[in-house]
């Protein structure tokens, strides 16, 4: 964000476009869960801004084209303004066509690596290297920690529940709902002749 606003080398407009584009790449990826190769193939015709019936939020519906074929993704509401900025930024240069790539520079691997290096964030707590793919991990972990259904996450990310459980098991404990696990079937009581031991919908043999 700071680099996008201030530019590089004391020149406010130097690399401004690239820095703003990178910032929105990070936000877009962490709010859609796309793989880097899927985002690199993404064209403007693949993304539609819609009103979601279930949540009544404005979101993105994305037709994802990857090595695994074509799938579909629904973004978070936060991705909408990001997409609008990406589209507007393209128009400043040239009106984007339906088949133009949303990220014309492809996957910003080198820039991501440089930024992570500057922030001393190249490796996570387990010593694994962070990459652009880590933004997909961010999306999945955030959804899990906010209580989203793991089956719906798997479907939206075009993967399996088994894969999510394998790679994100450490985060699954935060999704366990104690109220759902420790559920007790409630018994409705009715008072009859001073007794409170009969259920409200007792069998006919007991209530006769």
Where are these regions (language model features)?
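Active-site/catalytic core of tyrosine-dependent DNA strand-transfer enzymes
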Residues: 1-11, 21-22, 75-127, 133, ...
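C-terminal catalytic core of tyrosine-transesterase DNA break-rejoin enzymes
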Residues: 24-38, 114, 134-160, 174
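Residues in the recognition helix of alpha-helical DNA-binding motifs
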Residues: 42, 111, 115, 156, ...
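The DNA-recognition helices of helix-turn-helix-type DNA-binding domains
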Residues: 46, 90, 119, 147, ...
